[in-house]
Design a protein with these regions (language model features):
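Conserved beta/loop motifs at nucleotide-recognition and modification sites
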Residues: 172-174
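Polytopic transmembrane helical bundles with strong interfacial aromatic enrichment
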Residues: 1-143, 149-170, 192-250
């Protein structure tokens, strides 16, 4: 379960980088500033590397060979990405983002090919939440940076919440249509509201608050709100994995 969480989070974080104009950030035109500094891309690669290695260690030594290959390759690519984005003009930086994303999507598929859409929607939500929070910290270092990157990731977070709610809602409807409501025992009735209230509703409200706060350029306050969003999304997705494991055996 935690391995899935790590893989999805690494995938989501790297996916966020595609929204931050990586080509322009790596090679800004003369006289212009990059939308986001290369150090942020380097940080995201390092965080993704940590989650890739964490997933590999969590599954070891029973990790299937194809999945192990994917995770090892993803770890190498993210390590290379962190080095590349510390160099001038970040040679190959964008290619490493795309390649890492492709390998991690393959890892998600190998983990559970029957729920790839659910895994990708979870990756989008986790990545947008944590990516927004980490980007908020960047404004403490570079307070004059454009607000466009934060707006983009907050918009991505809102879209990811809608997508995740739709995917989970559809899965829940499919399950309830094929099972008697009597199967909703005490444990399921306890965790289901937690998953939706903590993992979807609360982050949606907080996302709106962070957006309104960012509009007045109170980036420190927005970052604080996004901390809470990250915690709620983490709890919601871990609960969702528990529910998925529970109902898949019924």
């Amino acid at each position: 379960m935690l391995a899935d969480f790590c893989i999805r989070l690494a995938l989501g974080l790297l996916g966020c980088l595609l929204l931050l104009s990586p080509i322009q950030s790596a090679r800004p035109a003369p006289g212009t500033r990059p939308l986001v500094g290369a150090n942020f891309f380097r940080t995201m690669f390092l965080v993704a590397l940590g989650f890739c290695v964490g997933a590999l260690l969590w599954l070891w030594p029973e990790v299937p060979t194809p999945l192990m290959v994917c995770l090892v390759i993803a770890s190498i690519l993210t390590l290379a990405g962190s080095v590349t984005w510390s160099l001038e003009r970040s040679p190959g930086g964008v290619s490493l983002i795309v390649a890492s994303i492709g390998v991690l999507i393959a890892a998600c598929y190998l983990r559970d090919e029957t729920s790839l859409v659910g895994g990708l929607s979870a990756a989008a939500l986790l990545g947008a939440a944590m990516g927004s929070m980490l980007l908020g910290h960047n404004y403490l270092i570079t307070p004059t940076m454009s607000m466009t990157p934060l707006y983009r990731l907050l918009a991505a977070l809102a879209i990811a919440l809608v997508l995740r709610a739709a995917v989970d809602g559809f899965a829940l409807l499919r399950w309830t249509s094929g099972h008697s409501m009597a199967n909703l025992n005490g444990d399921l009735l306890l965790w289901l509201p937690v998953r939706w209230l903590v993992g979807i509703v609360a982050p949606a409200l907080l996302c709106w608050m962070a957006w309104q706060t960012a509009r007045i350029r109170a980036t420190q306050s927005a970052t604080g709100i996004l901390y809470v969003v990250v915690v709620f999304c983490f709890l919601g997705e871990l609960t969702a994995q528990l529910l998925h494991k529970y109902i898949s055996h019924r």
